[in-house]
Each structure stands twice: as C-alpha cells, then as structure tokens.
C-alpha cells in the first residue's frame, strides 16, 4: 500500500538511496537548481529499518561557488510546506537554506561502499559523495572528459563487482559502465528508439542478469514501453 512520507519533504523528488551503514537516506531533486538532501531518522523500527515518520531533513552546502569539496549539512526548517506555497514558489525547500549547493537536474542515485553516487542531467555529470569524510567530487563530466561517450545521464546502478552502470535518457540510448578507475565502457545500445529513454536498470541477486526498460519503445508513446533482460554474468569489466 502507498503511504505519504511528509518527513522526507515536499519538493520535486527524483530518486533516493539508503546509506546502509548509517541508516541515512540521500535524495535528488529534479530541477535545474535542485538540492542534494539527506534524511536522518529519529530512530529505527523494531526490526532495525529506517523509521520514516520523523527525523531531520537536511540540504548540502558547499563553500562559496564551488561544486566540489567539503559538504556541510543544514537542517530544512519546514520540510513539508503547504502545496500552494510550492506552486507559487514560496518557501521551496532548497531556498530555505540560502547558501545551499545547486545541482543541475538531479537524477539517479546509488550507494556503494560508503559513498553516494548521483547523476545530474542538466550538465551531464556524475557525482560522488564520501559519507565518511563528507566530501563531494565530480566523477564524470561530459564537457571535460577525454572520451565523452556518455550523455543524457539518468538512472544508475552498481554491479556486485563495483562497476557503475549509467542509463542514458536520450543521448545515444546506451548503458555505459564506469569502472573503478574511471574508464568508460559501453555495455549496450538500443537502436531505433530515439524518442525513448532507458530507465530502471537493475541486477538480479546473482548478478548474472541485467534488467532495464525503454520507456516509450519504438513507438515513442507512453503505451509503447518495453522491458529487456540481458544475460551476463557481469563480472568485473
């Protein structure tokens, strides 16, 4: 059953990932000047899971105009303002903290070995936030990379071997992996579906099958979506 979670904030939610070690949530915002958010629950459920009913919603702050470096987290005072305020662009969460860092169209997000990775579609970047040292860097930048084959960055997922698979929304309709050394490896490309986007990449528990969807398929319409299975195994690339 669906359930509203007011403590997680009222904003243009895109994706969420759990820091399994600290039991924190990290959230992206799909807007050109979006925030990067963290939710710290007040406690856990009896079975050790995150209690979504209450906690602190925070937004990332960086020093000056820098988009890399040490992150400071500041509390959102009013995480769930009335909907009319949001519609009138009054009291939007990312503006409640004046110096919050701005990210150009937050998209997919994933956790791996103490780090949070997320994509921003407006500038075709992949970011990496280290939860231990609370520092953020740009892992991939289409505008400066010597081999910029990855564009339209969107949904992301990690293989069990630690390679980051990035799905393209448009671009060349590819899934491209970023290995631990930062090299780009094209995994697959869908042809003849230029009006679509690749969504929801996920691995089965054995890491031998990759699943993903083409949101609008060949027809380009919402009813034309197709889901694919790719057999591996997906060992270290």
Language model: regions and residue ranges:
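Sequence/structural signature of beta-propeller domains
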Residues: 1-237
